[in-house]
C-alpha cells in the first residue's frame, strides 16, 4: 500500500519508494559503461592499472554499492552514488575529452570511434544526472530526518 510520503507498507515494514530515480540512473549508467567497455576492448584502448582499478571500484562498483546500501541506509547510499558518479564524471571528462591520449575520443581507431564517442558522451550525461539525483535524494532524506 502506497502512502503520500513516498513510502509503501510491505507487511509490517515501511519501505521508501522515492528511490526509483536513483535505481534507474544507476542501471542506465551500468549499461552504458558495459557498452563503452566493449568499445574500449574493440578499439584496443587499454587503461593503466590505476585507471582500471578506478573504473572497477569507483565507476562500476561504487554506484551499485550505493544503490544496495540505499535500501537499508537511504542517505549514505545516495551520497555514495552521488560521489562515485561525480568521480566517474571527472575521470571521463579528463580522459575522453581533455587529455590527448589513447583514451581520447578523437584518437580512437576509426572503426570504433563512433561507438566510443557516443558512449563517452552518454556516460557524461548519465554521470551528471546520477550526481544530481544522488545529492537530491540524500539531502531530501536529510531534511526529512532533521
Predicted features along the sequence, with ranges:
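Cytosolic juxtamembrane helix and N-cap/initiation of the first transmembrane helix
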Residues: 1-29, 133-142
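C-terminal TM-helix exit segments that contain a strictly Trp-centered aromatic cap at the helix terminus
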Residues: 31-40, 83-102
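Individual transmembrane alpha-helices with interfacial aromatic-anchor signatures
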Residues: 109-129
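Transmembrane alpha-helix entry/boundary detector in multi-pass membrane proteins
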Residues: 19, 36-62
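Loop-to-transmembrane helix junctions at the membrane interface
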Residues: 67-93
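Juxtamembrane transmembrane-helix termini
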Residues: 39-49, 98-105, 133-146
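Alpha-helical transmembrane segments in multipass membrane proteins, preferentially the mid-helix core
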Residues: 61-70, 132-135
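Membrane-helix boundary connector in multi-pass membrane proteins
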Residues: 95-116
Amino acid at each position: 500500500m502506497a502512502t503520500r510520503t513516498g513510502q509503501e507498507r510491505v507487511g509490517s515494514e515501511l519501505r521508501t519508494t522515492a528511490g526509483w530515480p536513483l535505481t534507474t540512473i544507476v542501471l542506465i549508467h551500468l549499461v552504458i559503461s558495459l557498452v563503452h567497455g566493449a568499445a574500449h576492448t574493440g578499439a584496443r584502448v587499454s587503461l593503466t592499472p590505476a585507471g582500471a582499478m578506478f573504473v572497477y571500484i569507483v565507476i562500476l562498483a561504487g554506484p551499485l554499492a550505493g544503490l544496495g546500501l540505499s535500501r537499508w541506509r537511504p542517505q549514505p547510499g545516495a551520497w555514495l552514488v552521488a560521489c562515485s558518479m561525480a568521480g566517474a564524471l571527472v575521470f571521463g571528462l579528463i580522459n575522453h575529452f581533455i587529455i590527448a591520449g589513447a583514451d581520447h575520443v578523437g584518437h580512437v581507431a576509426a572503426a570504433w570511434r563512433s561507438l566510443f564517442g557516443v558512449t563517452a558522451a552518454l556516460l557524461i550525461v548519465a554521470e551528471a544526472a546520477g550526481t544530481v539525483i544522488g545529492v537530491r535524494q540524500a539531502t531530501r532524506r536529510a531534511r526529512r530526518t532533521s
